[in-house]
Amino acid sequence: MKWLPNAESSQRPGMNNQEDLLNDETNEDLESLLRLSVSQIIRKEDSEQFLHWFRDSAMLIAPEFFKQFPNDLDARCSFLSVFGRAIWNRTPLPSNHFRTRSLPKPERNAPCTCGSGRKFKQCCASVETLGSPFENLSLLSFVLDSLSASQREALPYAYLNHEELAFVARQWMEEGREKESVKLLEGLFADIS
């Protein structure tokens, strides 16, 4: 997984307790879900279309990941809604200079985003207020993986989060992708100077 360093954690950078909770199969399922989600987001950059796709597809793509949740339809719908929004909110968008474009937090009395027909405060608000266990998850590497080499060379480095870029470069080094990592860092340093 692609976990950003947690400033409050004494663990090695890039690791969080969340990763320790996932077994290999679950981790692979979640990584596939995130990769496909980012691909879907990048393809259209349409939040409504993505959230609809996510609600319909997530459990089919990552069955091992979703086995760890109670077999309660309302709870799963709530989680899918909140998790889909979290993925959207963490995905850097090419049309926004590779910065995120977060969805507004639903109003308490507005219809719930999960489609239940209930008010948000009576439905998914309790799930959303728990905070996201994925707040330190980096989706930038999935975004960059979806780009061609020429698109990567033209990245608007001034707009990108430099800490996250450095994290992705280190991750790629660990994966044996040294040349790609160097090109990413060269672009970053060229933009800084």
Say what each PLM segment does.
Residues 1-193:
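Acidic/negatively charged segments and metal-coordination signatures
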